[in-house]
């Protein structure tokens, strides 16, 4: 097994939101993940967490986050233990504080995917072990590591990249893209209707990070100016988990913000890549997709099937990179 080369001394540190790290630390984790990806491809052992036990707490369902944390843990030599919403009592029969103190006695690290940012913050405060945010309503830092790793793999650099996010500007992905991009020197544009712009608290954090690291953040409802010269176009579902009652309203607001061939052409570039954190409503091959078609007559929502499957799309590289970047976070903070 090769000796571990950590980007920075992050041992014992939690990752609850992007700006828990410096920009240099954040990109260092991306570079570390790229090294671990090579180890995986080469079959080089990298069991840096041999004998460690990892708790995977899930209030929300998951495909990529659960799979990524599970495989990453096993590859690193650790044992992952899944605790779903029916297994844990967070704030119901037992306080988050008490739960955290118990889990901290038994596990070496804790992942949490759920609703409240306060919950993951309390887990970190009271457990005494590193805690990693697998998604909350406010932030999605492990997704950002994978997203910006995918961009760096494609272009070779991050500083100066033009990234345009199109769609609902009031979700965790939009918040995190702004802040992480600003920390990495990326020019981030959030293209969204005026009624869905990011709240000031998140925008102001992003602006502060941009002033520190040389990135930029802009918000607009003008699709033409937002996507011009974009190296990356990113979108997400129009309705997040728990917002299903908003479908009709969001379709009305966001139908013109669909990522399609016309939008890609507006970039003026031939090498623009398309990203999506998944799952995506790009066809009718799911129960949701069929239901949306029956109710609204739509066969595609935030992205057309053509673009999703096109040479521009990097969505499955992006999904794979969840595992490599999560592995980097765990190894750097526990190894």
Curated annotation (Swiss-Prot):
Q: Please tell me where this protein is predominantly located.
A: cytoplasm
SUPFAM superfamilies, per the entry: Aspartate/ornithine carbamoyltransferase
Residues annotated as binding carbamoyl phosphate are 62-65, 89, 113, 140-143, 277-278, 322
Listed A to Z, the keywords are: Arginine metabolism, Cytoplasm, Transferase
- The answer to whether the entry has keyword Lipid biosynthesis is no
Instruction: Tell me the enzyme class.
Output: transferase
What pathway does the UniProt record associate with this protein? Amino-acid degradation; L-arginine degradation via ADI pathway; carbamoyl phosphate from L-arginine: step 2/2
The keyword tRNA processing appears for this protein = no
Q: Name one GO cellular component term.
A: cytoplasm
Reactions catalysed: carbamoyl phosphate + L-ornithine = L-citrulline + phosphate + H(+)
Gene3D superfamilies from the xrefs?
Answer: Aspartate/ornithine carbamoyltransferase
Residues recorded as binding L-ornithine, renumbered to this chain, are: 172, 236, 240-241
Q: What does the record list as GO biological process? A: arginine biosynthetic process via ornithine; arginine catabolic process to ornithine; citrulline biosynthetic process; L-arginine biosynthetic process
Q: Which GO terms describe its molecular function?
A: amino acid binding; ornithine carbamoyltransferase activity
Where does the record say this protein resides?
Answer: Cytoplasm
What domain of life does the native source organism fall in?
Answer: Bacteria
Q: What is its EC number?
A: 2.1.3.3
**What is the protein's known function?**
Reversibly catalyzes the transfer of the carbamoyl group from carbamoyl phosphate (CP) to the N(epsilon) atom of ornithine (ORN) to produce L-citrulline.
Similarity remark: Belongs to the aspartate/ornithine carbamoyltransferase superfamily. OTCase family.
The cross-references to PANTHER family, in alphabetical order and at most eight, read: ORNITHINE CARBAMOYLTRANSFERASE, CATABOLIC, ORNITHINE CARBAMOYLTRANSFERASE, MITOCHONDRIAL
What protein is this chain from? Ornithine carbamoyltransferase 2, catabolic
The species this protein was found in: Staphylococcus epidermidis (strain ATCC 12228 / FDA PCI 1200)
| Taxonomic lineage | Bacteria, Bacillati, Bacillota, Bacilli, Bacillales
């Amino acid at each position: 097994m090769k000796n571990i080369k950590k980007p920075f001394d992050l041992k014992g540190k939690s990752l609850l939101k992007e700006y828990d790290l410096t920009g240099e630390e954040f990109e260092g984790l991306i570079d570390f993940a790229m090294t671990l990806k090579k180890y995986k491809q080469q079959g080089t052992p990298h069991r840096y967490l041999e004998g460690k036990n990892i708790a995977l707490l899930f209030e929300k369902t998951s495909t990529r986050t659960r799979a990524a944390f599970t495989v990453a843990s096993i590859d690193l030599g650790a044992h992952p233990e899944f605790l779903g919403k029916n297994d844990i009592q967070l704030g119901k029969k037992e306080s988050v504080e008490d739960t955290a103190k118990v889990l901290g006695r038994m596990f070496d690290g804790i992942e949490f995917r759920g609703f409240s940012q306060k919950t993951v913050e309390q887990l970190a405060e009271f457990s005494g072990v590193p805690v990693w945010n697998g998604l909350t309503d406010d932030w999605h830092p492990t997704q950002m590591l994978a997203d910006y790793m995918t961009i760096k793999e494609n272009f070779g650099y991050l500083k100066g990249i033009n990234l345009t996010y199109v769609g609902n500007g009031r979700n965790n992905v939009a918040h995190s893209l702004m802040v992480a991009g600003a920390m990495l020197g990326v020019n981030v544009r959030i293209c969204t209707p005026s009624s869905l712009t990011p709240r000031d608290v998140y925008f102001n954090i992003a602006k502060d990070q941009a002033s520190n690291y040389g990135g930029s953040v802009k918000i607009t409802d003008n699709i033409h100016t937002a996507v011009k010269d974009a190296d990356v176009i990113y979108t997400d579902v129009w309705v997040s988990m728990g917002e299903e009652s908003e479908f009709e309203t969001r379709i009305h607001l966001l139908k013109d913000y669909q990522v399609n061939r016309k939008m890609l052409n507006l970039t003026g570039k031939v090498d623009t890549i398309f990203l999506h954190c998944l799952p995506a409503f790009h066809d009718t091959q799911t129960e949701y997709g069929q239901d949306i078609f029956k109710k609204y007559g739509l066969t595609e929502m935030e992205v057309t099937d053509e673009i999703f499957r096109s040479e521009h799309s990097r969505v499955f590289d992006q999904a794979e990179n969840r595992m490599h970047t999560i592995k980097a976070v765990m190894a750097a903070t526990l190894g």
